[in-house]
Amino acid sequence: LTANRTADFSAQADRIFGGKVENWIKFANSQKLRMALRISKANPTLAQQKAEEAVNHEVGVMTTNADNAELTLASTNPFEIIMYEYNGGDSRVSADITSYMNGYNDPRRAAMFTESTFADGGYYGIRTGINIPDGTIAHAYSNYNVKTDSKLIIMNSAESAFLRAEGALKGWNMGATAKELYEQGIKLSFEQWGVQGADAYIADNSSMPQGYKDPAGLNSYSGATSQITIAWDDADAAKNLERIITQKWIANFPLGIEAWSEYRRTGFPKLMPVVVN
């Protein structure tokens, strides 16, 4: 593709990038970077080689939200069907992500989720592995704020920045420092979701994930899943890895398969135990 990087084609034939070849190259390099991090424990030498190839390629990886891989759908967004139509619309967002974002007072909540309809409102997901409560209660928890015509996100530039941040943390040549790339990832995510306040959020060195108080009084969890804060700390590489993966997890919502893959690889984010049902 690189040899034909200017040979754009009909936008009618491309519902993701509108026929722009360079966007496809950036997407391919970003996927290559993702795969390099995935094998970084099994083959660190090859992982570094492939990651640096992707980032330092003449076209490079996704770096702005204009590069995001998003599918313009000819019909209904499948997440809208899953969350609002399938099985009586009893799917809801996870209590894990709402507990992290509530603790961080994350401005993206209103863009990502619907408010719960419990008496106190707020953003409350539902814990994994519960016995599903009756419909009235189940429907009161927060849902994914998705419309029938919402574009389907495949990969975003925020993830690319967080992947580069992890590579830089390992000492790889990622074109910037781990801190710079971590903060860039957060800013890109805020921009993607159309919210303000990224600078104040990045500087927050005290907020931590909350315990989970189930507004229905059924499955609360008082323990702290993690004490990870948001602000970068050059003195603690291990905590910075947790920061990177945690913020990537938030930025990648609702891409559950990628979240699960990274959880298996890194053990982050730290999650509540599954409720045995």
Report the location of each language-model feature.
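C-terminal functional modules
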Residues: 190-277
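Structured, solvent-exposed acidic/aromatic patches
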Residues: 1-197, 234-239, 247
